[in-house]
Amino acid sequence: MRSKQFFFIVILIVVFGSCKKTEIGNPGPNEVWLEYKAFNPTQIQVDSGSTITFTNKDNADHSVTANSGLFNSGKIKSGNTFTFTFNTKGTYYYYCNYHSSNSSEQGAIIVK
């Protein structure tokens, strides 16, 4: 009986030990993720001339639209990206057209 329990435990270790782990990470320094109907991070600071990549990691469609009208991604489907280069110093506020009532779907890029 003991050998059956040992064998069963070994099998469980092998099966679960070989399962792929999904890592939950964070965006890179010039990256904003659209996930869980929110921007992550909601605020980012970059140098003038920096390009920011917005990546939709959510199942829902999103957009990245500047309050000033400077940029508008249009619809960003799941898994797609939008990039924009910020050449002028200032603070640029943006939101998602699809979820603009959600305060988590608003953000700011601070260009130094």
Range-by-range predicted roles:
Residues 2, 6, 13-36:
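Bacterial Sec-dependent N-terminal signal peptides
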Residues 24-53, 111:
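N-terminal, post-signal-peptide metal-ligating segments of extracellular/periplasmic oxidoreductases
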Residues 30, 62-63, 107-108:
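Extracytoplasmic/periplasmic beta-strand context in beta-sandwich domains
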Residues 36, 55-58, 98-100:
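Non-cytosolic beta-sheet module surface loops
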Residues 42-58, 81-88:
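Beta-strand cores of secreted/periplasmic/IMS beta-sandwich domains, seen most often
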Residues 60-69:
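Short, Lys/Arg- and Gly-enriched loop/turn segments at beta-strand edges
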Residues 77-112:
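Extracellular/periplasmic metallocenter environments
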